[in-house]
Amino acid sequence: MEKYLSVTTLTKYLKMKFDKDPYLERVYLTGQVSNFRKRPTHQYFSLKDDHAVIQATIWSGIYQKLGFDLEEGMKINVIGRVQVYEPSGSYSIIIEKAEPDGVGALAIQFEQLKKKLTEEGLFQERFKQALPQFSKRIGVVTSRSGAVIRDIITTVSRRFPGVDILLYPTKVQGEGAAEEIARNIARANQRDDLDLLIIGRGGGSIEDLWAFNEEIVVRAIFESRLPVISSVGHETDVTLADFVADRRAATPTAAAELATPVTKLDVLAHLQNQEKRMVTAVRNVLSKKQEALKKCSQSVIFRQPERLYDGYLQRLDQLQLRLKQSLRTRISDNKQLVQARTHQLVQLSPVTKIQRYQDRLGQLDKLLGSQMALVYDAKVAEVKRLSEALLMLDTSRIVARGYAIVKKEESVVDSVESLKKKDQVTLLMRDGQVELEVKDVKTKEI
């Protein structure tokens, strides 16, 4: 009788075969990416050719180190291991390494990052800064030992001696180079005495120049407050740093020339030219002034200067005469005015008015005293009357005269209408009180 296997048993057997097969532990596979949708962590997709499809998985740690992004339809070469997934009975390849087929991964990464940064606008011309005409101090981010810094120092010293060069020794290739380049660009921007920044290195392979294609370097250049000149590799080499920099130079020497657009000889020639122009201008002015002075010295005014102020002397005499007449008239008018005001003041003397007001004040004082005495006597009589009335209302005085006061619940009873049968009342008398109960209520007929 045949023995039947369970699906689980068969699947486990196949998985064991897959796991132990040396040919499936490390598989070199080429195929086209299909059904790819980028996920935040692990990537799941298919690899296919014209006749077959296999499921593929890249764990997040591996994917982040690829250096390029997978795209739908991209043909890639991968290295991985084949495994069976028991719950579905399917098999797939777990990719450990991948690179684009035919084109290097760095070239793919270059184009992908270039596209991304272009869409963000980092390469737009409107963000480019103008280079200064005259720089007092230039920062250079490059290797300490390379020919780049020597060429820059030589060229700047030749073109404009006295310009300071501040070197930021930097690792320009290999692991950690991009971070160091970006860090030194940021350091240079923290100084207030730098006018310009040159970044660069000598020629090399795309791998050697790759640090200048890293996103961290591109963004550091874009965010630089200082204008940046890039000089990376040879003239045929192009990096993303060249796209984002304010100017690109094919060589370090060309970069130094861009950093010093005006040479010391240019300045000296300009100063000499300006000196000549100033001398010519001064001579022309002197010549014109001398000619004008000559004409003035020959004029009637210079030959007979008294004619210049004869008319003014006559005018001065007339003004002095008019001033004297005006002062006499003004003094006479003011004297008459003072006399008139003095007479008015005598007529309006306040002595009489003051005496009259004093007499009136004495009369009012006497009248006020008599009126206050009358009011006081009236108020005293009123107080006495009210005091006597209050004494009449004093309950102790009422009961002392032999009367009694009836109270119900602390209220004085002044009418039988406020009482009813069996009410409890208190009778206040001269020497005490009595608690009583109402037996009957009779109303007095009026």
Swiss-Prot record:
Keyword check for Cytoplasm: yes
InterPro entries xref list: Exonuc_VII_L (IPR003753), Exonuc_VII_lsu_C (IPR020579), OB-fold_nuc-bd_dom (IPR025824)
Keywords: Cytoplasm, Exonuclease, Hydrolase, Nuclease
Biological process per Gene Ontology, one example term: DNA catabolic process
Domain of life: Bacteria
Subunit-structure text: Heterooligomer composed of large and small subunits.
Record-annotated membrane-spanning stretches: none
Annotated function: Bidirectionally degrades single-stranded DNA into large acid-insoluble oligonucleotides, which are then degraded further into small acid-soluble oligonucleotides.
Catalyzed reactions: Exonucleolytic cleavage in either 5'- to 3'- or 3'- to 5'-direction to yield nucleoside 5'-phosphates
The keyword GTP-binding is annotated on this UniProt entry: no
Enzyme class (EC, first level): hydrolase
The protein, known as: Exodeoxyribonuclease 7 large subunit
Gene Ontology MF terms: exodeoxyribonuclease VII activity; nucleic acid binding
Intracellular or extracellular location(s): Cytoplasm
A Pfam cross-reference name: Exonuc_VII_L
Any one GO cellular component localisation term in the record: exodeoxyribonuclease VII complex
